[in-house]
């Protein structure tokens, strides 16, 4: 589908169109998932502009394309395809394992923040978790490819490890939760 017109006025009464031509309420669980994918994708772009490492930028752009692929597939009910596969999940897991091997073990939860880049990545992590919850809800009545849930779960781990790794690279001490 190509966008040729931005203002269509077809959504002015609380409905939107899907790729198959059907109309649904803008609060439909499928639309919630598509919207949350869009939020996360936009935020990954916001993370990207704070990063100077070309390798990480390329990796984040791959993630953005994966998220767009999932959103496009979601817009065609009943035809959801495996837009992210085992190789995509393996790439995320490799990023987590590599990054985590460079970090000290955690004793407590990490307080989000510390540096601008780290704070953005922690927010992206929470957005990925939110998307995961919405996808699980949709999956209950509308089966989705299982790899989607795995991918989004691993994606939040990627953002967590990248937040820690980049904060450390920026020379900012990591603050951990001190419970009383």
Where are these regions (language model features)?
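Phosphate/pyrophosphate-binding loop motifs in nucleotide- or prenyl diphosphate-using proteins
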Residues: 1-180
């Amino acid at each position: 589908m190509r966008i040729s017109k931005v203002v269509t006025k077809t959504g002015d009464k609380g409905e939107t169109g899907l790729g198959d031509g059907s109309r649904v309420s803008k609060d439909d669980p499928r639309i919630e998932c598509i919207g949350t994918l869009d939020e996360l994708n936009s935020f990954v772009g916001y993370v990207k502009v704070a990063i100077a490492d070309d390798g990480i930028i390329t990796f984040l752009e791959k993630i953005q394309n994966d998220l767009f692929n999932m959103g496009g597939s979601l817009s065609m009910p009943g035809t959801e395809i495996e837009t992210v596969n085992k190789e995509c999940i393996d790439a995320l897991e490799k990023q987590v394992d590599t990054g985590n091997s460079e970090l000290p073990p955690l004793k407590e939860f990490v307080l989000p923040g510390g540096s601008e880049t780290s704070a953005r990545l922690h927010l992206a992590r929470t957005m990925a978790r939110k998307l995961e919850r919405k996808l699980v809800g949709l999956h209950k009545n509308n089966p989705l490819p299982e790899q989607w849930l795995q991918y989004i779960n691993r994606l939040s781990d990627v953002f967590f490890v990248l937040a820690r790794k980049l904060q450390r690279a920026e020379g900012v001490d990591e603050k951990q939760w001190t419970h009383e």
